[in-house]
Amino acid sequence: MPQLDTSTWLTMILSMFLTLFIIFQLKISKHNFYHNPELTPTKMLKQNTPWEAKWTKIYLPLLLPL
């Protein structure tokens, strides 16, 4: 059974990392970033809930007979 030749693996792995690094650098360099990002003011609308419109009573549960 022949022995597996691993002498070129280091070269292949390093060249792969270098290629991936260059590809990602090129992709990032073509990305358009905003120069001065500003927050857009959001107007908070208050929603009226039914229990805020009128006063409601909270009743205790009925007592059970002993």
UniProtKB/Swiss-Prot annotation:
Stored InterPro entries: ATP8_mammal, ATP8_metazoa
Topology of the protein relative to the lipid bilayer: Single-pass membrane protein
TM spans (from-to): 8-24
Compartments, record wording: Mitochondrion membrane
UniProt modified residues of type N6-acetyllysine: K54, K57
GO biological process, one term: proton motive force-driven ATP synthesis
UniProt keyword terms in alphabetical order: Acetylation, ATP synthesis, CF(0), Hydrogen ion transport, Ion transport, Membrane, Mitochondrion, Transmembrane, Transmembrane helix, Transport
Positions bearing N6-succinyllysine: K54
Gene Ontology terms for molecular function: proton transmembrane transporter activity
Principal cellular location given in the protein's record: mitochondrion
GO cellular component, one term: mitochondrial membrane
Membership in a protein family: Belongs to the ATPase protein 8 family.
Subunit and partners: Component of the ATP synthase complex composed at least of ATP5F1A/subunit alpha, ATP5F1B/subunit beta, ATP5MC1/subunit c (homooctomer), MT-ATP6/subunit a, MT-ATP8/subunit 8, ATP5ME/subunit e, ATP5MF/subunit f, ATP5MG/subunit g, ATP5MK/subunit k, ATP5MJ/subunit j, ATP5F1C/subunit gamma, ATP5F1D/subunit delta, ATP5F1E/subunit epsilon, ATP5PF/subunit F6, ATP5PB/subunit b, ATP5PD/subunit d, ATP5PO/subunit OSCP.
PANTHER family per UniProt: ATP SYNTHASE PROTEIN 8
Function noted in UniProt: Subunit 8, of the mitochondrial membrane ATP synthase complex (F(1)F(0) ATP synthase or Complex V) that produces ATP from ADP in the presence of a proton gradient across the membrane which is generated by electron transport complexes of the respiratory chain. ATP synthase complex consist of a soluble F(1) head domain - the catalytic core - and a membrane F(1) domain - the membrane proton channel. These two domains are linked by a central stalk rotating inside the F(1) region and a stationary peripheral stalk.
Name of the protein this chain belongs to: ATP synthase F(0) complex subunit 8
Organism encoding this protein: Bos indicus
